[in-house]
Amino acid sequence: MSEQEKDQNNAEPQVETVEEQQAAAAAEAVEPTAEEKLAEVEVELAKVKKALAEADVRAQAEVQNVRKRAERDVQHARKFALEKFAGDLLSVADNLERGLAALDAEDDALKGAREGIELTLKSLLDAFARYNIEQINPADEPFNPELHEAMTMVPVPNVDPNSVIEVLEKGYQLNGRLIRPARVVVSKAP
């Protein structure tokens, strides 16, 4: 046999083998039936529906969170809108109290002025109460650094250490939030 014949004999089985492989692949790759295609489409549709449902739940949760956050911000703004204004009025209350302390209670000539200042102070404190502005007057109470500012410490016998012995300036809170701490003198051990 010549080499050409050998090559042809060798080539033919390879061609047949390739043809056989193609035929086998074609037989395996039989086109799916309409029912199989429908089943595949239904599976894909179910996946898409599930993804959309999850996205919808997340979107609704986000909307609720935004709504709650906005409501909380509005409540916070309403609750503490007066904070700066109230802070400015504190000095008025302080000055009225200082004026009362400076007036001689025994002097009949100043009785009318004293009553006028007392009524004005009472009116101001009533307005504070209507808007939840509370006065902090910690006389004879234990020192609380969250509500009080110690201006000085003085050794005092027969008084518990860290007790407020004098209030220099009353403190105030608006809806539980400290506007100004009470400025106090605190006792220390002798």
UniProtKB/Swiss-Prot annotation:
Pfam family, one: GrpE
Family the UniProt entry places it in: Belongs to the GrpE family.
PROSITE patterns in the cross-refs: GRPE (PS01071)
Keyword field contains Chaperone: yes
Subunit record text: Homodimer.
Listed NCBIfam families: PRK14150.1
A GO molecular-function descriptor: unfolded protein binding
Record-level GO BP terms: protein folding
Region of interest (Disordered), ranges: 1-33
Biased composition (Low complexity): 11-32
Domain of life: Bacteria
Alphabetical keyword list: Chaperone, Cytoplasm, Stress response
Organism placement in taxonomy: Bacteria, Pseudomonadati, Pseudomonadota, Gammaproteobacteria, Oceanospirillales
Xref: PANTHER family: GRPE PROTEIN, GRPE PROTEIN HOMOLOG, MITOCHONDRIAL
Protein's UniProt name: Protein GrpE
Protein localization: Cytoplasm
Protein species of origin: Alcanivorax borkumensis (strain ATCC 700651 / DSM 11573 / NCIMB 13689 / SK2)
Listed Gene3D superfamilies: 3.90.20.20, Head domain of nucleotide exchange factor GrpE
Protein task: Participates actively in the response to hyperosmotic and heat shock by preventing the aggregation of stress-denatured proteins, in association with DnaK and GrpE. It is the nucleotide exchange factor for DnaK and may function as a thermosensor. Unfolded proteins bind initially to DnaJ; upon interaction with the DnaJ-bound protein, DnaK hydrolyzes its bound ATP, resulting in the formation of a stable complex. GrpE releases ADP from DnaK; ATP binding to DnaK triggers the release of the substrate protein, thus completing the reaction cycle.
